[in-house]
Amino acid sequence: GLTVTVRGFQEPYSFDGYDLVIMGPGPGNPTEIGQPKIGHLHLAIRSLLSERRPFLAVCLSHQVLSLCLGLDLQRRQEPNQGVQKQIDLFGAAERVGFYNTFAARALQDRIEIPEVGPIEISRDRETGEVHALRGPRFASMQFHPESVLTREGPRIIADLLRHALVERRP
């Protein structure tokens, strides 16, 4: 079986000795770097990226990752709170649950970030809202895969975990 360790941002921890890190969903405003939790989340994600440690990011941490990668992040006109949508998740139609006030936006399906590598972007073609990201050693999602509104949550998590755990060279 798996061994899981849960740590709050204010607790001492190290990423050493773990096969995978899961960065949590929030709540919080991803742009308020002066807030201890948010500032810490930015530092942790930058560390995971630079050290190429496998990680999965959900909701708030997906938004912070998006900012760290240089994507545009905006407050939504109307928050998604318990909203189920069908999306294109890297070529597969999925019904997922959203609970977000902020959303990253992108105009393309793939970007190249120096020092990180190629990043695939799952997004709404009309609005540009980013649903998920896949890059070398990481995956992230704006929606909540653990929500009852996400029809195939365990499978989606498994697919994205497999992606994050496979070594890919930039």
Residue positions per predicted region:
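Flexible gly/pro-rich beta->alpha loop and the following alpha-helix that scaffold active-site loops
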Residues: G1-L56, L69
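Short, hydrophobic alpha-helical segments
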Residues: I157-P170
